[in-house]
Amino acid sequence: MPAKTKEPVALVITGPTASGKSALAHEVALRTGAEIISADSRQIYRELTIGSAKPTPEMLGEVPYHFINEKTIGEPYSSGAFATESRARIAMIRKRGNPVIVAGGSPLYLQGLIEGFSDLPPADPKIREKLQKELAEQGSRALYRKLQDLDPERAATLDHTKTHRLIRNLEIIELIGKSSKPPSPTPEMQFHAVALNFPREELYQRINLRVEEMMSEGLLQEAEALLKKYRPEISNRTLPALLTVGYQELFDHLERKTPLEGAVTLIQQHTRNYAKRQLTFLRNRMQLNWIQAPLTAQERTELAESLLS
């Protein structure tokens, strides 16, 4: 890989869920006067607060954040749109003379911003209709197995519940023979990107604890309000944002399909599975500098200082 000669336009801090990237980014921003670009595909939605682990109101008051609470869940928002809009925001922030930090763990958001996307074919209604029929008749697990056979690397970044992305990837394979072309470089912007590495068992313990904390903060009540407002969309699975881990399990509980204790256990399990997929994507599909995640506030302060040096 050729050396990058341009000055990085932003520091990127990523890693699996619950690895401490948001707290680290916030501390660096406080020390530098930076503005933070959230690369989290759920924090952009106003209605998803506790389950998306948004920064607290106090944090939002201390540091300028972008792509937090900017959309409603009825507004579709893609990784391509984020890549375009976040680059424009970065240019605007730097024009003001402020540093930029990108923080988040949504893999496609990060890949699109840092590496760019190749042009992909538009949706084909006939192919999509056929795949939707397969989904209805065979179920999402059958479509997932199909993607595993055709593109195991891409399948490793998904699971069978991500039906919109499953269908899109299978559609692209039918159109061009593979689910995605190699990313297009974006030489006009270079990034200093670090990823937080966490011992697997400790990460899983943090995930379990975080879910318990979210429940204490009112995640069940947040899910109940969403179910009351969006029951048809939840039943028909027409809004991808409402398929988010942490909400769909509680919707099932509220519909009397799962006891609460079982729903919480499933949230923990599914979040651990998501962290595993994040790690697979970040390690195999992106060029990142992996560093040891801080385990204490003191270690976080020391790491923040090292990132500034």
Curated annotation (Swiss-Prot):
Broad enzyme group: transferase
Nucleotide-binding among keywords: yes
Sites where the protein binds ATP: G15, P16, T17, A18, S19, G20, K21, S22
One annotated GO molecular function: ATP binding
Record carries keyword Transferase: yes
Cofactor(s) needed by this chain: Mg(2+)
Quaternary structure and interacting proteins, as annotated: Monomer.
Name used for this protein in its record: tRNA dimethylallyltransferase
